């Protein structure tokens, strides 16, 4: 059992005996009394999305998930192909199953496939992946005075902010949990 205040985007919980993936979660505090945890849940079975509100302090059952080491092979547009490393069996996930994880998938990336009752429902990425910068503005002398960074497009299409010294063609490390620049690779 997990407290609803600890729910995070991507977790899979059981609601009314059916597994649901947490698509969005927000906490709202009332002036007097307990807070409300508003969630957007997507049914793993049917794909329907519904809004569910929980009282602060409520507990929900976490789905019984299993994990297998796998490798990302390729994408054919709408589907993403993976291979289990232990028996070389291949699995296909849709873009909808992957959600934001699709922005970090490069060929041969090793990750964990997430299974619910022997059916793949998603992936668990490594905390940091190395991606190539394919487009960013050139740096100019004096850029660092204002601090901050500049926008960049990575090889997967992901758009993030990077420090001014990062140039097109360089490889950088990106945190898959936050989507932020970590360091040069």
From Swiss-Prot:
GO biological process per UniProt: peptide biosynthetic process
Cell location: Cytoplasm
Gene Ontology MF terms: translation elongation factor activity
InterPro entries to which the protein is assigned, alphabetical: Elong-fact-P_C, NA-bd_OB-fold, Rib_uL2_dom2, Transl_elong_fac_P/YeiP, Transl_elong_KOW-like, Transl_elong_P/YeiP_cen, Transl_elong_P/YeiP_CS, Transl_elongation_fac_P
Location, primary (coarse class): cytoplasm
Origin: domain of life: Bacteria
Disulfide bonds: none
Keywords: Cytoplasm, Elongation factor, Protein biosynthesis
UniProt pathway annotation: Protein biosynthesis; polypeptide chain elongation
GO cellular component: cytoplasm
PANTHER family: ELONGATION FACTOR P, ELONGATION FACTOR P (EF-P) FAMILY PROTEIN
Role, per record: Involved in peptide bond synthesis. Stimulates efficient translation and peptide-bond synthesis on native or reconstituted 70S ribosomes in vitro. Probably functions indirectly by altering the affinity of the ribosome for aminoacyl-tRNA, thus increasing their reactivity as acceptors for peptidyl transferase.
Family: Belongs to the elongation factor P family.
Name of the protein in its database record: Elongation factor P
């Amino acid at each position: 059992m997990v407290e609803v205040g600890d729910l995070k985007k991507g977790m899979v919980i059981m609601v009314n005996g059916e597994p649901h993936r947490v698509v969005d979660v927000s906490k709202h505090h009332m002036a007097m009394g307990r807070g409300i945890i508003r969630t957007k849940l997507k049914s793993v079975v049917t794909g329907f999305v519904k809004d569910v509100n929980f009282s602060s302090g409520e507990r929900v059952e976490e789905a019984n998930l299993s994990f297998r080491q796998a490798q990302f092979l390729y994408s054919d547009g709408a589907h993403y192909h993976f291979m289990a490393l232990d028996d070389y069996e291949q699995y296909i996930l849709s873009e909808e199953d992957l959600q934001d994880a699709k922005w970090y998938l490069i060929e041969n990336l090793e990750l964990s496939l997430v299974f619910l009752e022997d059916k793949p429902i998603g992936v668990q990425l490594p905390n940091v992946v190395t991606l190539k910068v394919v487009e960013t503005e050139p740096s100019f002398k004096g850029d660092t005075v204002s601090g901050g960074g500049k926008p960049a497009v990575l090889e997967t299409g992901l758009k993030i902010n990077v420090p001014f010294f990062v140039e097109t063609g360089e490889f950088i490390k990106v945190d898959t949990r936050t989507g932020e620049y970590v360091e040069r690779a």
